[in-house]
A protein has these predicted regions:
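Signature of alpha-helical transmembrane segments and their immediate interfacial
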Residues: 1-17, 409, 421, 478-535, ...
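Short helix-loop junctions at transmembrane helix boundaries
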Residues: 18-21, 302, 352-368, 428-445, ...
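Extracytoplasmic/periplasmic
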Residues: 6-100, 105-108, 130-157, 534-607, ...
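Helix-loop junctions and hydrophobic alpha-helical segments within the transmembrane domains
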Residues: 299, 306, 310, 385, ...
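Hydrophobic transmembrane alpha-helices and their membrane-interface caps
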Residues: 8-11, 322-389, 854-938, 943-959, ...
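Flexible hinge/switch segments at interdomain interfaces of large molecular machines
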Residues: 17-28, 64-70, 105-126, 154-160, ...
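Extracytoplasmic/periplasmic membrane-proximal domains and adjacent transmembrane bundles
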Residues: 31, 73, 99, 143-322, ...
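Transmembrane alpha-helices and their membrane-interface boundaries in multi-pass membrane transporters
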Residues: 374-388, 410-429, 436-484, 604, ...
């Protein structure tokens, strides 16, 4: 015991400490840039070619691709248990073999996606230019990444450097130049080239050419051409050279000032406390040496939430432990209660001792599992301790009494632990995002139960063997008097109240069975009738309010900046209002405000500090203060830990994009029929206008091809990459193109000239034309088919989202499948996760019950008694439903996990009871007397195990902090399920036992009569 305690204590520093466990990401990303290309072109030239090259590889579960302007990304979902590194190598081989990629595209990169633990963000903000801000950010990044416990530091949304050589159409005509000539001149002059070595006797002398241009002055001095008189035409005479940033629309403000973020990550062995403390210390020290007017702020600190949740779980766990000890002290001898309580510590320390070797650490899931097992691990010790105490009370000596008492319950205790483990086993195999993260629960539970079994069967009896008999004249102290009174009351209640009541129930056992069946049906009707609200993931308030406003495609960047300023101003006003209130004088309600303006999109992030701030109410105020946002295409605000997206989401796949375009209108019309459905959007909602070029007949006579026109248009508007220069740790692109003003207007296409191969200049309008077509912002594909996603929101008083989706699929789905050949329809989003989760739980829960049924059948040598053991499971579900209804909680995925946990607990009492009844019958006792005596004998341990499980969870069930809200549904399911199932164990199980005996007697009688009848019908042989 001492070794387990020491081992557990020394293992704590070895455990990873993080907010949530590391998820398993079995994905590979193939990314390829094709700058300046439209989504449709990226799809055809990049995404489709990659998909066709790799789709038949072994190990691929699913292929998804996204084609956006200038980049194509293909995501490969790897099959479970297939080696990801092997598939990555196979994909690399296939992709490298593709020779049909566009020549202007970048090389594809194939990356195995690994999870990185974000440990917060350091925000740099102040009165600096964008270049000064980035230069400072790069210095701070390099310093911070060298700190201990820090793996990766990334600059957030910092625009890459770029050298832009801008040549106007007028300059090209004035100097009779083409983009190709300027490009060739720059490439020829800006170069570093090793030229070998002069092999001298004294040693080699390296020959180097150093003409690489690195900054604006270097490029401006490049000679484009010179005449015979020596007069030179410099690049500065023809073009404007701008040493600037890539043309990306992004502008970040933090607390009203220009800002840049440093994201801090840890890749392996995360320790949220050590890492964040290191970063905080570095920030405090480094801020002292920053330029005037520049500040650092460490925020989005995960250690804050981690500490708060650890504090909540530990305090509630200790509170539950105290309540458990109090309950034990009220009914058991102090020494017995003490050693039973020590069993909890031993089980926990043993679990901590082995936990590092299971791949689990200390996080919200594993800590909650410890809390969950608080009332479970004590059950074995209570049953063994009570049995030993009873044996010793009958006059058996200490050691002999301990052996006899332990042997009497060893079978039900062992099978109870095994059955509980089997019921928790499905959590090892849960699908979806939360599957791998939930493994901490069964790992902790199984380890704790294993050590609890060792402690209760080996360690506890050895302690109880030396417990002195209770004195004939008990101590007159208040504790003894209280314990004797409680124990006496419980014994009298069992004999004088419970036993007569049970006898009446047994004489009317059929009616008792019908009564419990009605209760079960009532609870199922309560759930199925919609009286209980459900949500796959409970909405739990976060420390942040996140706002996103999407503007119409093609709008000016100034519109995004104006919208960002509008959101920030509204947030600042609310911040001032809240922080001026008296209750927030010590701790402000709102701290930091981040506003990001991007291309047609604005993001707002508001950090709350005070625990008692209602972020839901604050979000409503923020939304109302913004007023009319009709000019926005989409507005979303979220204040929860996990944004589930819209509750209705349907995914359609087809090889015909025209079919999907028409289908999008059909789906909208179908959803609009349901009351309460609003804000219907689809992935074709955001059209992107495209200019499509075509040649005129005159072009052929001039020898101009469509390729010539396309290339020169690309050079003018997107630009041509001349070279890349290494500078300040990154590759800087050097681009030649039109000035920004000429690239902003469509009319400039008509005014530009196309150069022929013989040097002639022809107006664009003479040889080509263009038309405006509607394209897409992005094109999504699933398993080599284009997809359409339609999503919608549902009002609180509307129909359940799942019911709406199922109705649409049932009524409209067959029509769409017939109308659009090759169409596939799937649920998507949280609804799909919910269905997969429920199906997995039903399947694996049923499998667990079959396994337990088989184990019980072997143990009891009966097929009826295992059924009696498992009757507790549906009635545990009944208790969970009534618990959610009484306390007003939504049924969520955690509620279902609580029901599974409850199932593993409630069968234990049935096992103990049935085993005792069987022993009494083996001793020759009449069935009715055995039922009454066995239930009375096991009344105290059954009540104690149920009450300790319940009271151990009461503190977390009554917790009001945000940190506990998403765990309470599981606690409600377990605690109320155990309490309701206790009544089933003490009343229904004996009644069903008797009913089974009646059925057995009836079947025996019927069989006997059939045998007698068949014997009479046999014709006697002729003599």
């Amino acid at each position: 015991m001492v070794l387990l305690i020491i081992g557990g204590y020394t293992s704590i520093p070895k455990l990873d400490k993080q907010f949530f466990p590391t998820p398993e990401i079995n994905q590979i990303e193939i990314r390829m840039e094709f700058r300046g290309a439209s989504p449709r072109e990226v799809e055809e030239q990049i995404s489709v070619r990659i998909e066709e090259a790799i789709h038949d590889l072994n190990g691929i579960e699913e292929l998804r691709s996204t084609s956006r302007e200038g980049v194509g990304v293909v995501f490969v979902e790897v099959e479970t248990d297939y080696p990801t590194q092997k598939l990555t190598n196979d994909i690399n081989t296939r992709v490298d073999a593709i020779r049909s990629f566009p020549s202007d595209a970048e090389r594809p990169t194939v990356t195995e996606i690994t999870y990185r633990h974000q440990m917060g963000r350091v925000q740099i903000y102040g009165d600096l230019s964008e270049r000064e801000m980035k230069e400072l950010g790069e210095i701070l990044r390099d310093e911070l990444v060298r700190q201990p416990w820090v793996s990766i530091v990334e600059l957030q949304t910092a625009r890459p450097y770029e050298v832009s050589i801008e040549v106007s159409e007028d300059s090209l005509q004035r100097y009779q130049l083409t983009f190709d000539q300027v490009t060739t001149a720059v490439r020829s002059a800006s170069v570093n080239l090793p030229a070998g070595a002069v092999q001298r006797d004294s040693g080699d002398l390296l020959i180097q050419t150093r003409g690489q241009a690195y900054d604006r002055a270097d490029f401006e001095s490049i000679v484009l051409r010179s005449d015979v008189s020596g007069q030179e035409l410099l690049l500065s005479d023809v073009a404007t050279v701008r040493d600037t940033f890539e043309d990306i629309d992004v502008d970040i403000e933090f607390n009203g000032k220009r800002s840049l973020g440093l994201n801090v990550y840890v890749t392996t062995s995360p320790d949220v406390i050590l890492t964040t403390n290191t970063v905080k210390a570095w920030v405090a020290e480094r801020e002292l040496s920053l330029p005037e007017g520049v500040s650092l702020e460490f925020w989005q600190d995960p250690s804050k939430s981690f500490k708060e949740r650890v504090r909540t779980l530990v305090s509630n766990g200790l509170g539950g432990l105290v309540l458990v000890i109090i309950v034990l002290m009220l009914f058991l001898r102090p020494m017995l209660a003490f050693w039973v309580s020590v069993g909890i510590v031993v089980a926990y320390m043993g679990t901590l001792f082995l936990l590092p070797y299971t791949g689990q650490g200390l996080n919200m899931i594993s800590l909650f599992a410890f809390l969950l097992t608080l009332g479970i691990v004590v059950d074995d010790a209570i049953i063994v301790g009570e049995s030993v105490h009873s044996a010793q009370s009958r006059g058996l000596s200490g050691v002999h009494g301990a052996l006899v008492g332990t042997r009497q319950v060893v079978k039900p205790v062992v099978f109870a632990v095994i059955s509980t483990m089997v019921f928790f086993a499905p959590m090892f195999f849960l699908p979806g995002e939360w599957g791998p993260a939930s493994k901490g629960i069964p790992v902790v539970v199984c380890l704790a139960l294993a050590f609890s079994l060792i402690e209760s069967l080996l360690i506890l009896p050895s302690h109880l063997a030396h417990m002195k008999p209770e004195p004939a004249i008990p101590d007159s102290g208040w504790l003894t008097r209280t314990r004797m009174a409680c124990a006496g009351w419980l014994a009298r209640f069992a004999n004088e109240r419970y036993r007569p009541f049970l006898e009446k129930c047994l004489r009317n056992h059929a009616s008792v069975g019908g009564f419990f069946l009605v209760l079960l049906c009532l609870s199922l009707a309560l759930f199925g009738g919609g009286y209980l609200k459900s949500a796959f993931f409970p909405r739990v308030n976060s420390d942040f309010v996140v706002g996103t406003v999407e503007l119409p495609q093609g709008g000016a960047f100034a519109d995004s900046q104006a919208m960002r300023d509008r959101l920030v101003t509204a947030a600042e006003a609310i911040k001032t209002d809240y922080n001026s209130q008296s209750r927030y004088q010590q701790t402000p309600a709102i701290d930091n405000i981040l506003g990001v303006a991007g291309a047609n999109k604005v993001d707002l992030l508001v950090q709350t500090v005070s625990d008692d701030l209602d972020t839901e109410e604050m979000t409503k105020r923020l939304r109302q203060s913004l007023g009319d946002l009709s000019q926005a295409k989409d507005v979303r605000f979220d204040y929860t830990i996990r944004d589930p997206g819209k509750p209705i989401s349907l995914l359609f796949a087809s090889d015909s994009i025209s079919d999907l375009e028409v289908l999008s209108q059909d789906v909208r019309a179908a959803l609009e029929r349901y009351p309460g459905v609003f804000d219907i959007t689809d992935s074709f909602d955001a059209p992107l206008e495209e200019l499509v070029l075509s040649l005129k007949p005159a072009a052929e006579a001039l020898g101009i091809t469509l390729s010539d026109v396309a290339k020169q248009i690309r050079q003018a508007f997107y630009g041509e990459e001349v070279q890349r220069i290494p500078r300040d740790g990154e590759d800087v692109r050097v681009m030649i193109r039109y000035p920004e003003a000429e690239r902003r207007a469509i009319a400039n296409i008509n005014s530009m000239y196309i150069r022929t191969r013989d040097g002639a200049e022809v107006p664009f309008s003479t040889v080509a034309t263009y038309r405006v077509e509607t394209g897409y912002q992005s094109i999504e594909r699933l398993d080599r088919l284009r997809t359409l996603e339609v999503s919608a929101d549902v009002a609180e008083d509307g129909a359940p989202p799942r019911g709406i989706v199922e109705s649409v699929l049932r009524n409209d789905g067959p029509v769409w499948l017939q109308r659009y050949p090759g169409l596939t329809i799937n649920m998507d989003g949280e609804l799909q996760e919910e269905i997969e989760f429920q199906q997995a739980m039903v399947y694996m829960g049923s499998l667990s019950m079959l396994v337990i049924f088989g184990l019980m059948a072997i143990a009891f040598k009966s097929y009826w008694q295992p059924f009696l053991v498992l009757t507790a499971v549906p009635f545990g579900l009944m208790g969970a439903i009534f618990g959610h209804w009484l306390l007003g909680w939504q049924v969520s995925m955690f509620s279902i996990m609580g029901v599974i946990a409850c199932a593993g607990v409630v069968v234990n009492d049935n096992l103990v009871l049935i085993d005792r009844i069987n022993n009494l019958r083996d001793e020759g006792m009449d069935l009715l007397d055995a039922l009454l005596q066995g239930a009375t004998d096991r009344f105290r341990p059954i009540i104690l195990t149920s009450v300790t499980t319940f009271v151990g969870l009461v503190p977390i069930m009554l917790e009001t902090s945000v940190q506990a809200q998403f765990l309470i549904p599981m606690v409600v399911s377990l605690s109320f399920g155990v309490m309701f199932a206790t009544g089933v164990t003490l009343v229904l199980v004996p009644a069903l036992y008797l009913l089974g005996d009646d059925v057995g007697k009836y079947l025996t009688l019927v069989t006997k009569r059939e045998i007698e009848r068949s014997d009479r019908d046999v014709t006697p042989p002729l003599v």
